[in-house]
Amino acid sequence: MKIFDTHVHIDEYAKPEPGRLLKSMDAHGVDRTVLLSEEPFFFGKEGLTPEEWNRARLARLMEWTNTSGGRLLPVYYIDPTEPDAIDQADRAIDAGAIGFKVICETFFPGDDRAMPVYQHIADAGKAILFHSGILWDYGNNGNYNRPCNWECMFDISGIRFALAHISWPWCDECISLYGKFSAMSYSPRYKGQKMYIDMTPGTPTYYRQKAMDALYSVFSEGYEYLDRRLLFGSDSFTGDFDSFFQADLAAKDSEKLQKAGFTAETAENIICAN
């Protein structure tokens, strides 16, 4: 079984070592890995200005990915509320970024500053991976990341977006929101919006099988295209990167998906093709 991991973080200030990652991937049957760039300018970065920091981390992202033959895929982590967010998005796209990562740490997804940035990204044909669910940091920001806050995507034409971690602990809310977007294709408001669910852990082991059972249940009851809108991810980091973990998680997730009722072929597509 080939593996496509859509959720691996680049450690801050890390020296790009794509060869190390590719060697580990080859050893464990991992075909492709999405690398998420270092974080935006939330705090001071060694005396750099925000623009200097953002340019530097974009350059490192491309150093991690440019020589990988398409196996390490660059996704740029952007704060859509920053004044120059659209300029950042354009620089990232010009450099070769395939999409964007957003964490709503201090703002709601539908913030007026962010919405034009989402539309700009959608117009460029790029997708957005959002953190969703409880955020394990020291901020009071859980309510920013509840799935129903992404109803704002109804107002973004052509957007493709994913909610990560099955939005744990709000997995049912995430799945319900998917159902709403699935049904939206029959609405006059439908303008090509597509929602995906990133199954990257965040869901503790006890809940993970339950979440997959719920996903299959609603799929079997008519949530359209759900089998093609689930993504596999490991939430790994480049610093201690070991594709054994990716492969082990992929095998366990495949087993859970099949236990829930998905066919072996569908489980394989979720792990390697979606």
Per-segment meaning from a language model:
Residues H7, M25, L61, T65, ...:
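Conserved, mostly hydrophobic/aromatic
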Residues G99, D111-L231:
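Catalytic pocket-lining loop regions of alpha/beta-barrel enzymes
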Residues F4-D11, H131, H165:
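Histidine-centered divalent metal-coordination motifs
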Residues E39-F43, T65-E82, Y216-E224, R228:
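Metal-cofactor-binding active-site regions of metalloenzymes
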Residues V8, Y13, R20-G47, R71-Y77, ...:
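Divalent metal-dependent hydrolysis catalytic cores, especially in the metallo-beta-lactamase
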Residues I10-P18, F41-G44, P50-N54, I78-A85, ...:
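Acidic-and-aromatic substrate-binding clefts and catalytic sites of carbohydrate-active enzymes
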Residues G47-Y144, Y196, P201:
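Active-site gating/metal-coordination segments in enzymes
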Residues M1-H9, P16-R32, D90, E224-L231, ...:
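Mid-to-C-terminal alpha-helical segments outside catalytic/metal-binding sites
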